[in-house]
Regions:
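Conserved CoA-thioester-binding segment of acyl-CoA-metabolizing enzymes
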Residues: 1-60
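Terminal low-complexity tails and localization/encapsulation signals of metabolic enzymes
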Residues: 1-6, 260-273
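Structural motif
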Residues: 31, 116-117
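Glycine- (often His-adjacent) and acidic-residue-rich active-site loop
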Residues: 59-102, 121
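C-terminal long alpha-helix characteristic of the crotonase
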Residues: 136-141, 192-240, 244-253, 269-273
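Acidic, divalent-metal-coordinating active-site segment for phosphoryl/phosphodiester hydrolysis
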Residues: 178-185
């Protein structure tokens, strides 16, 4: 399926990697209503496609994502209109709801999701990276919680994910000052798994995605689910969930393949069954 503002490509040894590119380079991939809608469609379709083992999200051109596009339409009401001159606040609320539904669809993906951050990454773009499971960034990347600079807190869940990744103090600094964080500082804080030169970004991201693609899909999905669902649980309750997941994978074909490949001293070929 073709889109106006999103490029999709299947890559990998089994074509199990869904490579998603935000494609508004002239706007630094700012998220318009159309881009939000098309991303949501991509994520929803990926969730029901068993052949997808990993999703990669990146940006075309020199930026990853400059946040939501507030240059026109109902989104403009959120930033530029005064209380007296606002004419389409209902449209602005609809825009925010569409944004939220797109990120809910992203979080619902049960396969690992990797952000490949090639440049500027602010506002809703940073939220997107925070909602991914892993991230690879180039040294050209810069990160910012931009909402506070506009007197807003129209955050798309970054307040939820960011403190869990980089820690409370760093997240609070970003959310209350709006200062840019460079690639090196962001990597040191734990926002990214790998930091490479711009020329190495795609290759390093592909290396990580291929490692994910080669893994056991059932075990990966259950592991991701447990990591998220058990946050806030007590230890014993979390172990109960883990026991259920262990029992499920123990009865799978992939478990048998893992055992055979170990005995035969070869790399396993997992099928997700």
């Amino acid at each position: 399926m073709s889109y106006e503002t999103v490029l999709t490509e299947r890559r990998g040894e089994t074509s199990g990697i869904l490579w998603v590119t935000l494609n508004r380079p002239e706007k630094l991939n700012a998220l318009s209503m159309t881009l939000f809608d098309e991303l949501r469609q991509v994520f929803q379709q990926a969730r029901t496609d068993r052949s997808v083992r990993c999703v990669v999200i990146t940006g075309a051109g020199r930026g990853f994502c400059a946040g939501a596009d507030f240059s026109g339409g109902p989104a403009k009401e959120l930033v530029y209109a005064s209380q007296e001159s606002a004419t389409d606040l209902e449209g602005a609320r609809l825009f925010f709801r569409n944004e939220s539904e797109t990120y809910i669809a992203l979080k619902r993906l049960d396969v690992p999701v990797i952000a490949s951050v090639n440049g500027v990454c602010v506002g809703a773009g940073l939220d997107m990276v925070a909602h991914c499971d892993m991230a690879v960034a180039s040294t050209a990347a810069r990160f910012q919680v931009a909402y506070v600079k506009r007197g807003l807190f129209a955050d798309l869940g970054g307040f939820y994910s960011l403190p869990r990744i980089i820690g409370w103090r760093k997240a609070m600094e970003m959310m209350t000052t709006g200062r840019f964080m460079g690639a090196e500082e962001a990597h040191a804080a734990g926002l990214t798994n790998y930091l490479v030169s711009p020329d190495e970004l795609e290759a390093k991201t592909m290396e990580l995605a291929l490692a994910v693609e080669a893994g056991p899909p059932l075990g990966q999905k259950l592991g991701k689910m447990l990591a998220y669902r058990t946050q806030g649980m007590d230890f014993e309750s979390a172990l109960e969930f883990s026991g259920i997941a262990l029992g499920t994978t123990a009865m799978s074909e992939d478990r048998n393949e893992g055992r055979r490949s170990f005995a035969e001293k070869r790399e396993p070929k997992f099928t997700g069954r």
